[in-house]
Amino acid sequence: MSPPWKLFADHLRLTVRLTPNGGRDAFDGIETGSEGETYLKARVTAIPEKGKANKALIALVSKSLGVAKSSITLVSGETARKKILRIEGDPEDLAKKLETLSG
């Protein structure tokens, strides 16, 4: 199973499946979708209204990886459960942190 992130020269792209209004802000491991794609499962307490859940996801990723919120950009999936995040920084270091988070 390939990880739900891809390394680039100066950033990492992370695929996430977000559950808004999920009772707590946390990651729930890596899952493989029906089409074989992998994603990091995340849940946030925020509701999916006016970008609140997306902001909560960025805050969760920022805190968990120890990076600034401003270094995380939502590339796609603004109104979908499946999202792609661009995270600026050392991609190797970010990948190691994600491996630890995803169990």
From Swiss-Prot:
Gene3D superfamilies cross-referenced by the UniProt entry: YggU-like
SUPFAM superfamilies in the cross-refs: YggU-like
Pfam family, one: DUF167
Superkingdom of origin: Bacteria
UniProt record similarity statement: Belongs to the UPF0235 family.
Protein name: UPF0235 protein RHECIAT_CH0004196
Taxonomic lineage: Bacteria, Pseudomonadati, Pseudomonadota, Alphaproteobacteria, Hyphomicrobiales
